[in-house]
C-alpha cells in the first residue's frame, strides 16, 4: 500500500448496523485435510489450518474435532494463542511453552503483530485501497453473528487493497489493525462487498459464488519469543 493515508470507507450510518442475511442451517462437517506444520521449534508451532475446521472444540460432542484436538495428539504441550474462524484457512500459531504463550499473548493484546489476509469479494470497489473504521459488538439475538455499532461497539479497523479485479468479483489483500470476531467479514459486508462463500454475512448470490469462504490468513509476522527477532510465516492462498 502507498504511504498516503487510505480512503476512509467507514459506513455512514452512525447507528447499529446488523446483518439482514437470514439464518442458514449449519451442520459441522470437518474436512479430512490434515493440519500442515509450517514451522516448529522449541517455542513455536506454526500451522496451516484448513477451511471448515474449528480452531478449538465446541461444546457439542460432534464439535470435538478441531485444530487443537488434532494437534495435541502429536504435540501435547502446544497451547492455543489465537483463533481463526472455522471457515477461514491459513496461518495460525500455537505456543510450546508457558513463557512463549505469555510472550505471544502480549503481542496479540498490544497489537504488535502484522497479519495479512487474502479475500475474494462480491463486486468491484471504485478505489484501489481503503480503510474501514467501524466499531463492532455481538449481535446478541443472532449469535454468533457480530454487528457494527458506533455507540457501543469496540474499535475495529481494517485496511484493504485491490490485488485483482475480475468480472463482478475482486481479490483483496486485507490488513486488520484490530482482532474483533468476524471483523473482516462484517467490515466488507458493511461497505457492500461481502466475502464470497460467507454463510453468515453474504447474500445468496455472493454465498453461492464459491464453494467455501474465500478468506485466507496468508501471512503472520511476529517477534520470536526466544530473542525478540522478527519472523514471518506464510501459507500460500489456495484459491
Predicted regions and their residues:
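RNA pseudouridine synthases
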Residues: 2-239
